[in-house]
Amino acid sequence: MASCLSLLVAIILCFSSLQCSNAIGKGYRLISMEKSPDDGSFIGYLQVKQSNKIYGSDITILRLFINYRTDHRLRVHITDAKKQRWEVPYNLLRREQPPNVIGKSRKSPVTVQEISGPELILIFTVDPFSFAVRRRSNGETIFNTSSSDESFGEMVFKDQYLEISTSLPKDASLYGFGENSQANGIKLVPNEPYTLFTEDVSAFNLNTDLYGSHPVYMDLRNVSGKAYAHSVLLLNSHGMDVFYRGDSLTYKVIGGVFDFYFFAGPSPLNVVDQYTSLIGRPAPMPYWSLGFHQCRWGYRNVSVVKDVVDNYQKAKIPLDVIWNDADYMDGYKDFTLDLVNFPHAKLLSFLDRIHKMGMKYVVIKDPGIGVNASYGVYQRGMASDVFIKYEGKPFLAQVWPGPVYFPDFLNPKTVSWWGDEIRRFHELVPIDGLWIDMNEINATGHKASLGFKTIPTSAYHYNGVREYDAHSIYGFSEAIATHKALLAVQGKRPFILSRSTFVGSGQYAAHWTGDNQGTWQSLQVSISTMLNFGIFGVPMVGSDICGFFPPTPEELCNRWIEVGAFYPFSRDHADYYAPRKELYQWGTVAESARNALGMRYKLLPFLYTLNYEAHMSGAPIARPLFFSFPEFTECYGLSKQFLLGSSLMISPVLEQGKTQVEALFPPGSWYHMFDMTQVVVSKNGRLFTLPAPFNVVNVHLYQNAILPMQQVVAFPAGASEGYASGKLFLDDDELPEMKLGNGKSTYIDFYASVGNESVKIWSQVKEGQFALSQGLVIEKVIVLGLKGTWKVSEILLNGSSISNETKTIEVSSKEQMYVVGSEDEGESKSFMVELKGLEMLVGKDFNISWKMASTNVLSMAGNEVIAR
């Protein structure tokens, strides 16, 4: 839902001027360093070299805390040695807390200048103090605060101004620092400031700070032909500007501490695994949330919502979740129902109907609570004293209901009150998920600079915490409270969609990218933003398909669903004032939707398995190509294509009037998912121009992968290797936890190989009872990329000849045509073989093999197994 206003707010601390930095501070000297006998951590003290009053007084003595919590994670924490400073609350983002004893600085001799970990080595200089982080494996320096080359100033640490810089190699590729609408793609652009301060600035504005704050970046470098990735997190919730100059990076922060975490990687997947092991693994999502969602601000009554559901059915476009924006509320008041337009009995009848169809219902909640003496939610909130204060009273703001107070989610009483209100509403309306919006916080009706469209930075939270300090964690704290409430009320796996996010939000909520435009540029930017959030640990992400506002041309909506069908979170949503944009509004768009969403629904088991991988290791669902091809430097800046998982590549049309797409194909064989007779082969990796008429989206599966699908499990393997592997996770998706060992989940490893004139496909099942209880079977096998002949003989199923089985197996084949680069050599065609009628139980190990009639079989370029 849009806010009342859309204005650009920027925090300008100091423009990227070297003179400005040098004038601010002269740095610190290290005066002591000691090793803790308990855990091997180090504690040191720093003394300011020369104090001044620019931006306030320097903090005289700082405490330095260093530790290695894992083999691949280093922490460097710098704070005031004499006074406790604000940090992201340890009860919200759980992590090790440095010693909290504030004492006098010691002046013991500094006897070490290097602290070694298994992979990351910390090196520091004494005067002026600086530190560098170096890899043990290749000697590469990944972070270096020394200003010896005078490209930036010394470290500055004042009460309301902190500054620190690092040098960088000019060929480093950086990603992250969001949420930001990056018009130039996912790769950070030198000489652009990146502001981090959660605010309600719509994504209409490009290259600007948006709803979330994620002060983390990934650095990908190619060192002598080998790729190394690492990540750096500055865990700080204050507003900050980050200046990237190509050869250096400077942080300018308006408070808090320096709390740096370094993650060694070395692969991009290693990095997100290490990062999410600290900030929290992404939340497991219910299976239904991976279906298609429809929403609009302006579904003004139950009949309109019912018509939308009916029209999707008539158009034969899949729809799993219907949403209501604030239209269902009484006067925009949270936890209320407009009994005129949404009569309780009529709404319950509608929900009963869609629930029987397997559909779900999600509604919006804004944090602002209407100030109304007859409003029970307000009354109970006042009685429990749950609102943010200003000058001793609840802060009065203006949002949709009129005058509002904002809940203080740092207050334990607020969390309890919020949970009780959700319980009460759920008893009234059996919702399946919640959408928490405008939680940056968004507010209007007062004058401020930094606090414009939010609450004053001098407002305060529980225990006297200033809004100045806690502003950017508001949406995060609300997501935690909402997750706790839904879990308690439903006893099921919660689904929450949040606009504002912070470090760790992915542990509790999905995210959509806010109020975007119905423009071609917004379509392009949606991919970059989606890929960034995978790096941030929020893999369940998507943008408003067809754009939130203004009117969207038919051609654009046509192309947008071809992209949006492959967002991890796939939802069509539009503004109240925009024309209707449901996918059935245009004939050509409906056809594209049936095609693209039809493929998405086939991919649901695959997407759900990616959801499991994300929950277990932080692996993004949607990924940049460099995650799978880190040595292929041509894809480092690629933002117009993306991968789902490690091997499924989407290459959409993103420009008006185009009926073909120029796509980059990393080295190997790629199989078209919509027409498996088409194969793209590139020996060294290159651009290919592919046809892309309306209703066609280029989706390709890479060699050596196994792809579990609805009715299909695909096994492509490489022409040179003849081996493929993959996996499938199944469970009761209502369980709060997503894991093996609970008796209600199954995990399958699939394998396939070609050799000695035979093809073999087999599985290894862990805890198969759940899959057996669901009656799931593999019905069809398709093998792609066979050389020589398609003729199949001597089919064996679990060691027995298929002729001994009572089932009838159908065998068919098609020729595959290759698109081969002009510089490449090799075969120009192959064969795909399909076996139907297998009915192999998913919950039991299976082994199927057959002989090929020709001796010309060389290897398997790809294969596919289909499960029903």
Swiss-Prot record:
Glycan attachment residues as annotated in the record: 144, 222, 301, 372, 442, 756, 798, 804, 847
Catalytic activity, as annotated: Hydrolysis of terminal, non-reducing alpha-D-xylose residues with release of alpha-D-xylose
Enzyme Commission identifier(s): 3.2.1.177
CDD domains per record: GH31_MGAM_SI_GAA, GH31_N
UniProt GO molecular function: alpha-D-xyloside xylohydrolase; carbohydrate binding
Cell membrane keyword on record: no
Cellular-component GO terms for this entry: apoplast; cytosol; plasmodesma
Signal peptide: 1-23
Cellular compartments annotated: Secreted, Cell wall; Secreted, Extracellular space, Apoplast
UniProt-annotated catalytic positions: 437, 440, 515 (proton donor)
One GO-annotated biological process of the protein: polysaccharide catabolic process
Pfam families according to UniProt: Gal_mutarotas_2 (PF13802), Glyco_hydro_31_2nd (PF01055), Glyco_hydro_31_3rd (PF21365)
UniProt-listed InterPro entries: Gal_mutarotase_sf_dom, Glyco_hydro_31_AS, Glyco_hydro_31_C, Glyco_hydro_31_N_dom, Glyco_hydro_31_TIM, Glyco_hydro_b, Glycoside_hydrolase_SF
Primary location group: secreted
Keyword set, alphabetical order: Apoplast, Carbohydrate metabolism, Cell wall, Cell wall biogenesis/degradation, Glycoprotein, Glycosidase, Hydrolase, Polysaccharide degradation, Secreted, Signal
Family: Belongs to the glycosyl hydrolase 31 family.
Protein name as annotated: Putative alpha-xylosidase 2
Gene: XYL2
